[in-house]
């Protein structure tokens, strides 16, 4: 699916080689992982240091689902930035629903992608999977206990299937940070996991 990004890679190559001076615009939308700004700012800074003229705009909302961005005004805001790449980072909040439904999640992603493609028909879309999360349970009146959210892995599979079915590139952050066995533990040990 990375071939979908070839036009974007070519723009980066031309910029890096000095054959282009056009600013490359990346818009990254998503949930609290984007709202927290650590990931998008680090990514944007590294890209700018490497390639030069990069505009990296993050639009993160705590508690966001992919449907949070299916409002016409939000799609217009994204389109007004004239992006060369749109990155979609969702899945954490969808998977926190104890009645998580793969079919519903698939349909919601489809609605967002259709709206983006209607407004930005030639812009490649890159989907990232969530990094893993914990479920919180009340053990007693004053104590809570936490366990790894088992629905994250299901949401990741749904997202990968959707991306494959619909021609989106995917960066599987869930697997990159440790997958079902280690994603949460690795993030927690690195002090990258924060409470919402």
Question: Model-found features: residue ranges?
Answer:
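Proline-centered loop/turn at the N-terminus of a beta-strand
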Residues: 123-126, 169
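Catalytic His-Asp segment of secreted/periplasmic serine-dependent ester chemistry enzymes
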Residues: 133-196
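Residue-level recognition of beta-strand->loop/alpha-helix junctions
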Residues: 58-60, 129, 172-175
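Alpha/beta-hydrolase-fold catalytic nucleophile elbow
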Residues: 89, 128-129
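Membrane/wall-proximal cationic-aromatic binding patches
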Residues: 1-28, 70-74
């Amino acid at each position: 699916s990375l071939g979908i990004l070839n036009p974007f890679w070519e723009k980066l190559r031309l910029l890096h080689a000095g054959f282009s001076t056009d600013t490359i615009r990346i818009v990254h939308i998503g949930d609290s992982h984007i709202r927290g700004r650590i990931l998008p700012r680090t990514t944007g800074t590294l890209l700018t240091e490497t390639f030069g003229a990069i505009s990296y705009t993050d639009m993160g909302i705590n508690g966001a689902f992919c449907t949070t961005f299916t409002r016409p005004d939000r799609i217009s805001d994204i389109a007004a930035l004239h992006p060369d790449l749109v990155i979609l980072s969702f899945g954490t909040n969808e998977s926190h629903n104890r009645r998580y439904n793969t079919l519903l999640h698939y349909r919601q992603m489809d609605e967002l992608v259709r709206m983006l493609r209607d407004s930005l028909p030639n812009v490649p879309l890159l989907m990232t999977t969530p990094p893993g999360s914990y479920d919180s349970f009340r053990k007693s009146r004053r104590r809570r206990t936490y366990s790894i959210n088992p629905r994250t892995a299901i949401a990741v599979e749904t997202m990968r299937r959707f991306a494959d079915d619909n021609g989106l590139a995917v960066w599987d952050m869930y697997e990159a940070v440790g997958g079902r066995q280690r994603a949460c533990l690795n993030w927690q040990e690195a002090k990258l996991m924060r409470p919402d």
